[in-house]
């Protein structure tokens, strides 16, 4: 029995340490149980890409790490003049993590990366539901920004100390059953560079 247990522990350890590798040496795409969003009542799973969407302090992030970004832009929703968002180059490791304030992996579809930004959309079931939205926004430490074009729709933005990322929080809002729609804000169409 002891030999069986030892064998089981060793095999389990080896299996956990293995990474799935394609014949040409690349890592197989990862699909995580946590990487999904809701669309029209259907759970849509996402396949991870090889880049990251980050929010960083432009004044403090090292120049070496800034050169690893494909895109670097300011965002009015960040409210801090030194904060910017950026997209890392494929398979890049940002070493100055202390000054990266928000990170989200990319996802891929047919060779094109797309990203979940730091924001998500929520549609109220009724205009009287605004206090419910405000309460949940406070609970998850996200900021509400009113979308003027569509009634009952609100854009919410993850603050830097938010309890999680925009994908996870959008899912939690939807799964609460308190809102008609809650879905992440995607940014995409960036072709992978090999």
Go through each PLM region and give its residues.
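Long, structured stretches of catalytic cores involved in phosphate-ester chemistry, encompassing
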Residues: 1
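Sec-dependent N-terminal signal peptides
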Residues: 4-14
């Amino acid at each position: 029995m002891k030999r069986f247990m030892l064998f089981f522990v060793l095999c389990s350890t080896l299996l956990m340490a293995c990474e799935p590798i394609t014949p040409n040496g690349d890592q197989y795409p990862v699909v995580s149980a946590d990487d999904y969003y809701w669309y029209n009542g259907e759970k849509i799973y996402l396949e991870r890409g090889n880049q990251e969407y980050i929010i960083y302090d432009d004044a403090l992030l090292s120049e070496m790490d800034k050169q690893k970004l494909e895109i670097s832009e300011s965002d009015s929703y960040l409210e801090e003049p030194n904060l910017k968002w950026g997209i890392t180059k494929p398979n890049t490791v940002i070493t100055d993590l202390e000054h990266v304030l928000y990170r989200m992996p990319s996802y891929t579809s047919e060779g094109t990366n797309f990203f979940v930004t730091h924001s998500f959309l929520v549609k109220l079931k009724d205009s009287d539901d605004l206090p419910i939205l405000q309460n949940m926004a406070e609970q998850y430490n996200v900021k509400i920004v009113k979308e003027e074009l569509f009634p009952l729709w609100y854009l919410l933005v993850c603050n830097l100390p938010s309890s999680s990322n925009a994908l996870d929080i959008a899912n939690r809002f939807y799964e609460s059953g308190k809102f008609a729609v809650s879905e992440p804000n995607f940014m995409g169409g960036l072709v992978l560079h090999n």
